[in-house]
Every structure is written in structure tokens, then in C-alpha cells.
Amino acid sequence: MIYKSYFLENNINSLNEKITLFYGENLGLKNDLKGKIIYNNKNSEILRFTQEELTKNNRALINEIQNISLFEKSKIFFIENVNDKLLDLIQETESIISDRKIFLFADILDKKSKLRSYMEKSKNCACVPCYE
């Protein structure tokens, strides 16, 4: 599913997919959307990763998804600087993620990008292009 960024600026809660990819050159828009996600999920535990951290230890994300917290209702994951190298891990997590959400943030991804293509076609994933 592909969402228009201007639609989400006022309706960020309409993101129902488990995994959402924000990509493009408009860093300010991506940061605004990230802020709205955080604001609307105040009771959730927010965990942040970079792609570099996850490529060094790809079990870190899987372990955090499978950990059940007694104190927090849900978990939200932000993964920064993603590209095609993370596709295998995303596919693996898509099958085990339940009430958690993953938000991926990338720079410019061209149409040939495997990650972008997968996210656009998957039923559990969404894409949000962030261009000016």
C-alpha cells in the first residue's frame, strides 16, 4: 500500500499496517511524521535501531519483538537509514510481528529498490514517499 504523505500529516492513525517505510529526501517531513507517531503512541515503548546495528546483530530486532513486557502495552520500532540490505530481516519479522509496529526510515530509494518494491506489494506493509 502506498500512502500520500500529505494525507498522513492529518491522519497518521490511518496507518494500520505492521511495517511502514518512509523514504525520500524530505527529512523535515519524515521527522514530523515520526513525531506524530510518537505523540499518538505515548503509552507504547519506543525502541530505536539503525540498519548498521541490525546488520551486526540481526537477532536484536527479533528478540525485542518476541519479548513480552509486563509494563508496556505495546512496542514500536524505529529503524533508521535502511536500504535493500535489510530486506531479509524485514521479511522474517513480518511473519512473527503481532501487535507491534515497525517504522523504517530511508533516504531516496529508486524504483528498482528491492525493499521499496516489497513494501509496496506486501499486504502487511506500507510505503510513504516523502518528497517536496
List each language-model region with its residue ranges.
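Non-catalytic interfacial helical region
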Residues: 1-20, 25-132
